[in-house]
Amino acid sequence: MKLCVALDLSTKEECLQLAKELKNLDIWLKVGLRAYLRDGFKFIEELKKVDDFKIFLDLKIHDIPNTMADACEEISKLGVDMINIHASAGKIAMQEVMTRLSKFSKRPLVLAVSALTSFDEENFFSIYRQKIEEAVINFSKISYENGLDGMVCSVFESKIIKEHTQRNFLTLTPGIRPFGEKNDDQKRVANLTMARENLSDFIVVGRPIYKDNNPRKICEKILQEI
């Protein structure tokens, strides 16, 4: 299980300072939509200069198939290590993205977003007319069959996804509160033990790390636990 630290701070300077504090740790860094729109592709280069971090660019691409493929191709030129697209874009979009990225000698991992961890059952059903688990199983089967590398999901769906695909089909699980911190805007949250028991391959932790007075110590504690 790998730790992915979310760089969801207010300024680029704060993000870079956090990255410097976490040098030489076996972690990934997650760059989200806010940071990417604010700081651009050069921010990725600056992070790589701090240390040879693995970068997950979390933009949740969702559009018509050709536009998604164009976007993923441009993102892949940045040298990031993992990207994500929305599973609800459908299998044609998945096929076009994976075909386009196949020309790269080293392409990023491509994960499909299933059900955002900000959803609870009631809100999810009001949109999709399905239970979360039913939709996630369907999304994961389609994603696996069309060559994606894994899914973004809550801890509660991670093991189920692997049961319906393969053990090596990756799961990245946001909403991790490692030591029982408050949920904030997440609905389906979990701790480290739950992530381990449900076979998560990547856990995403943000606020519990960067809001602590000693982020490196918290990261080291999490790494010891996993």
From Swiss-Prot:
Q: Name one GO biological process term.
A: 'de novo' UMP biosynthetic process
A single cellular component GO annotation: cytosol
Q: List keywords of the entry alphabetically.
A: Decarboxylase, Lyase, Pyrimidine biosynthesis
Provide the catalytic activity annotation.
orotidine 5'-phosphate + H(+) = UMP + CO2
Q: Which residues form the active site?
A: K60
Q: Which domain of life is it from?
A: Bacteria
Which InterPro entries does this chain map to? Aldolase_TIM, OMPdecase, OMPdecase_AS, OMPdecase_bac, OMPdeCOase_dom, RibuloseP-bd_barrel
Which GO-annotated molecular functions does the record name? orotidine-5'-phosphate decarboxylase activity
Report the Pfam families cross-referenced here. OMPdecase
Q: Where does substrate bind?
A: 8, 30, 58-67, 117, 177, 186, 206-207
> Could you tell me which pathway this protein works in?
Pyrimidine metabolism; UMP biosynthesis via de novo pathway; UMP from orotate: step 2/2
Supply the EC number(s).
4.1.1.23
Against SMART domains, the record matches this protein to:
OMPdecase (SM00934)
Q: What does this protein do?
A: Catalyzes the decarboxylation of orotidine 5'-monophosphate (OMP) to uridine 5'-monophosphate (UMP).
- How is the quaternary structure described? Homodimer.
Q: Which family does it belong to?
A: Belongs to the OMP decarboxylase family. Type 1 subfamily.
Protein name in UniProt? Orotidine 5'-phosphate decarboxylase
| Species assigned in the record | Campylobacter jejuni subsp. jejuni serotype O:23/36 (strain 81-176)
